[in-house]
């Protein structure tokens, strides 16, 4: 298994291009299953392991996939007949549950192995099941697989008990090809929810209200292929913003939607970091001298849970005490023990981390326990004194394209071994 070696202490300067959004791509690609006519050309897809994993899954189901470049995929799902997704790729990747909504919508049946992904606590799919059943599907969980069947899907009103990105997207997928009108309430508003809705509409769906509290879906009889470009990745952008703040320097982060970054931008400015918005880019200027802040993760437009771990790393060297409350996922402090190896002063109580800033971190051998923890450890290595080796790089590769090359272009000393 490969690892990253980082010699810390270099300020970051230059420009970095942000790739397409992982969280959008891993839903849009399964949604191409629903196009019974024509070819879907998906542009600005990130060149990451999670996308490669979905490519393999779709191939196994009978989709014809042509990769035109590192960021453009052509997917022809017209001849797909298989509705049983049971490979190891399905089991290891959480976003494979979007196959359920896509297959149920088009074929009115699906069997999908229960998915995996990052080990960050209990991540149930009860709200997905509630939505599918409300549309008229029969749902069973048997031998580690979700089995859904329906004679037909009928639109209805569905109120989610909790705000769930996955359930919002999955039920929206199924409702797109249901009969009549579906109203989804207490839905997630994340940018990638809106992106999936926009993609479905480009295929011929009738979805209104994505990004608001209520999504209204008028069912259509079929969807057709289209050309669509995935939105920029707000989490990747936030990671480079935080890294620049931590290391000092000046970096312009291109191909972003600044509105999607507002909660991150506001927190960095509160800490004393300069952030300048310029159309489709943001520039971060930092002297490496900033104060602590309190963070509470919340659904969009609140502070994103996927940026909590990188931000926690920044706070380890901030002046004063910071309190981080993780309200979205339990067990998302697995990076803390690794940061402690580098000299961080952090105490975890339940879903809260109390961080007292220290003058510096020092290099150590650490591991990436999950995707965003991996990004946190890269930032820790960049800001630390001395050499850091990061094991478990496969987690990082799931969501960050060419992370070592991008940081190296900014002046970091980082290599893959």
From Swiss-Prot:
Chain positions recorded as UDP-N-acetyl-alpha-D-glucosamine binding sites: 94, 123-127, 306, 328
Record-level GO BP terms: cell division; cell wall organization; peptidoglycan biosynthetic process; regulation of cell shape; UDP-N-acetylgalactosamine biosynthetic process
| Annotated coiled-coil segments of the chain | none
Gene Ontology molecular function:
UDP-N-acetylglucosamine 1-carboxyvinyltransferase activity
Q: Where in the cell is it found?
A: Cytoplasm
Cell membrane keyword on record? no
Catalytic residues, per the record, are 118
Write out the similarity annotation: Belongs to the EPSP synthase family. MurA subfamily.
What role is this protein assigned?
Cell wall formation. Adds enolpyruvyl to UDP-N-acetylglucosamine.
What name appears for this protein in its UniProt entry? UDP-N-acetylglucosamine 1-carboxyvinyltransferase
Record the organism.
Clostridium botulinum (strain ATCC 19397 / Type A)
Underlying gene: murA
């Amino acid at each position: 298994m490969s690892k990253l070696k980082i010699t810390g202490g270099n300020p970051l300067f230059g420009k970095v291009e942000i790739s397409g959004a992982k969280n959008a791509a891993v839903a849009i690609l399964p949604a191409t299953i629903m196009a019974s006519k024509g070819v879907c050309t998906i542009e600005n897809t990130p060149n990451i392991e999670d996308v490669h994993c979905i490519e393999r899954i779709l191939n196994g189901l009978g989709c014809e996939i042509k990769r035109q470049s590192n960021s453009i995929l052509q997917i022809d799902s017209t001849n797909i007949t298989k509705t049983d997704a049971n490979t190891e790729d399905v089991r290891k990747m959480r976003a494979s549950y979007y196959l359920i909504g896509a297959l149920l919508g088009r074929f009115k049946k699906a069997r999908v192995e229960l998915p995996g992904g990052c080990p960050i606590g209990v991540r149930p799919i009860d709200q997905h099941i509630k939505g599918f059943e409300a549309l008229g599907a029969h749902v069973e969980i048997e031998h580690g697989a979700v089995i859904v069947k329906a004679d037909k899907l009928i639109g209805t009103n569905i109120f989610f008990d909790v705000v769930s990105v996955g359930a919002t997207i999955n039920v929206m997928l199924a409702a797109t090809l249901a009969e009549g009108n579906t109203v989804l309430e207490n839905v997630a508003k994340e940018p990638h929810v809106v992106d999936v809705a926009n993609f479905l509409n480009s295929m011929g769906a009738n979805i209104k209200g994505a990004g608001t509290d209520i999504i209204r879906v008028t069912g259509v009889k079929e969807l057709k292929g289209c050309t669509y470009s995935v939105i920029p990745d707000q989490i990747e952008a936030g990671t480079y913003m935080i890294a620049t703040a931590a290391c000092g320097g000046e970096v312009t982060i291109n191909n972003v939607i600044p509105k999607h970054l507002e909660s991150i931008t506001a927190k960095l400015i509160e800490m004393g970091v300069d952030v300048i918005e310029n159309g489709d880019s943001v520039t971060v200027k930092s002297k490496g001298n900033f104060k602590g802040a309190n963070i509470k993760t919340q659904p969009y437009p609140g502070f994103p849970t996927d940026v909590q771990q990188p931000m926690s790393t920044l706070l380890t060297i901030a002046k004063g005490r910071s309190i981080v409350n993780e309200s979205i996922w339990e067990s998302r402090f697995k990076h803390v023990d690794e940061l402690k190896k580098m000299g961080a002063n952090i105490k975890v109580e339940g879903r809260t981390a109390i961080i007292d800033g220290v003058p510096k971190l020092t290099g150590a051998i650490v591991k990436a326990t999950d995707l965003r923890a991996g990004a946190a450890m890269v930032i820790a290595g960049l800001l630390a004194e001395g050499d850091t080796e990061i094991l478990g790089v496969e987690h990082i590769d799931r969501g960050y394209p060419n992370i070592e090359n991008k940081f190296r272009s900014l002046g970091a000393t980082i290599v893959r071994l």
